[in-house]
Amino acid sequence: IFFWLTFLYFFLRYMIVDKYMPINADGQKTEDGEKKGGLGPLFTIFYFVLIIMSQLFINMKLTQTICGDDVQTSTAMSATIIPNVLILGVVYIMLVLVPGWKAPFSNTFGYFAANLGGIRDVLNTLTNTNFEEKGEGNITLKQNQINIFKSIYKNPSQLINNITPENFHKFLQTMQNIKYFKPSNEHTDKNIKKLYSLVVIKDLVSQFFWYMLAGYLVITTTFDSLINMKCQSSEQRLKELAAKSEVN
């Protein structure tokens, strides 16, 4: 259940919220980004509520099995909420405050997913390849700049791994200022939006793996806690047990 809820959360976040550029190349807020931006926190709150409620339901059933049909509500609640707050909650906060934590998964699994989506081709489509020629529409640069740009064009993986949703606008401005990207037009702007959406995929895949690790730790911690708990029988349950013992 945790896997599918987490997968659905990130899929919907991408499709409805995160794939839209919040700021365009000119530094102006985009219409789509402005409309969808406020939905992100709502998705996150709804996700955490669903995760805790689903785990609580399962854990209450587990206590019922362990304690002979006597549900341990308070024990199940503490064993569910505390690990989620201390583990999954802390991971969420750290990924927001320290985005660099996402790099190990973003630069591996995230890069693989973005590469399947064609991020290298999109980046190369944006690249100005006419550095050495002179004439209308072409760029003349120093030889060392040309060599650097050619190297990046042949193997853009390092450049791709340095792009994040947080620094995308700054990256875009830098590429345009040094003339690495082609001048802005309708076709270029469309590819920039596509590049951003693929960078977001790379980032979300990284977050997904972090959540899965945290979720695994939460579930194992909760399970161990419930397996070793002391059952607290209700007054009604004690009366039933006493009646059975008298009959015997």
Show where each model-derived region lies.
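N-terminal first transmembrane alpha-helix
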Residues: 1-112, 201-212, 223-240
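Membrane-proximal N-terminal segments immediately preceding the first transmembrane helix
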Residues: 9-24, 180-196
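Short, flexible coil/linker elements and helix-boundary hinge sites characteristic
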Residues: 21, 64, 99, 128, ...
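Membrane-interface segments at the starts/ends of alpha-helical transmembrane spans
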Residues: 29-40, 71-77, 139-161, 176, ...
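Charge-rich cytosolic interhelical loops and cytosolic tails of multi-pass membrane proteins
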Residues: 87-189
